[in-house]
């Protein structure tokens, strides 16, 4: 993982030993590099124009301390719930730098978004448009909106993270766009700023991005010819990170070409990157509980479970696994598994590792879709989160306690 260094056999994040962090704060524990997070965001901010917007996808990692850090650097935010919106406002984000995506926005969430006058509510269906119009009328306030297009394009990634196919729940199919825009315009309650699309996550093929962009440009030009004053194209997010030696697309190389296509049309760009900002900033540290040998396999049973980090179980996702301190021990093939009472509670199969029962493991690239997807399954306590920058260490979420686990059940 980028941002990790091995010094005299010990693994470091920034200038801090992961072994020392595990000993100080216990395991499992998430650890993030603040310097890597800043570097990733700046890779986007330095590649766009002043009027363009980079809106970090909050769902990838929504810890408020990270949101504050990103807001201070000038990031906008892409939210998919009312509470994500509230978190961003609490973190100091400007409403004009927030977009609200997602297919199931409640009336309460729409009231909040319209009252706060956020940059855009991205409309996902005619039924949602009807609700937005009604809410705006009740509030006597215009809603700022873009229309999300379903481009029917595959992101060539896991089916669960493809969002641009015709069969997905997201966005408006092309044949429904004109009538939807006409309804929005006639209402007098919608300020239509542009059109949006998001193909999906883990994109490594640049052609998919430009297939989507060219479709959006064609649709935007058609709407502009009809008299609609659009100013933005929201291209979504989706640039992939390298979990297993995939060749990453660099923001600058992609965005220079994107902007060159938008400039002649006087259209601004909005992006919603998530994983490519937070993904490679974090590790999940876990200690060995048992080294179990059967006639066929060696199991490394660790103290992290699928409740702590779901991606390997849910998506069969590959994450590199390293020992935080190298030891003089024979390398063996291990099945790295957790303690949860599910056969799917696995983190890696046939991993070649040199281990003993005191070893601490680092599961790499766990900064996105890690803690945010954790749960209390098996009545397990969710882990803490630590932010490291240089030599500075900050606890940004404490470890849950048994009292925390009971509180919502007892205090009723």
Please give the residue ranges for each predicted region.
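General structural feature for long, well-ordered alpha-helical segments within catalytic domains
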Residues: 17, 33-36, 40, 44, ...
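Active-site beta-loop-alpha junctions enriched in small/polar residues
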Residues: 57-63, 80-83, 103-105, 124-126, ...
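Active-site loop/helix belt of alpha/beta enzymes
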Residues: 2, 152-291, 347, 353, ...
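Conserved, mostly hydrophobic/aromatic
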Residues: 37, 59, 81, 113, ...
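Structured core elements
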Residues: 76, 99, 120-122, 146-148, ...
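A charged N-terminal "starter" segment
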Residues: 1-143, 187-191, 225, 349, ...
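Charged (often Lys/Glu-rich) extended helix/loop segments that serve as interaction or gating elements
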Residues: 257, 266-412
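Short acidic, glycine/serine/threonine-rich loops at helix termini
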Residues: 67, 90, 110-115, 132-135, ...
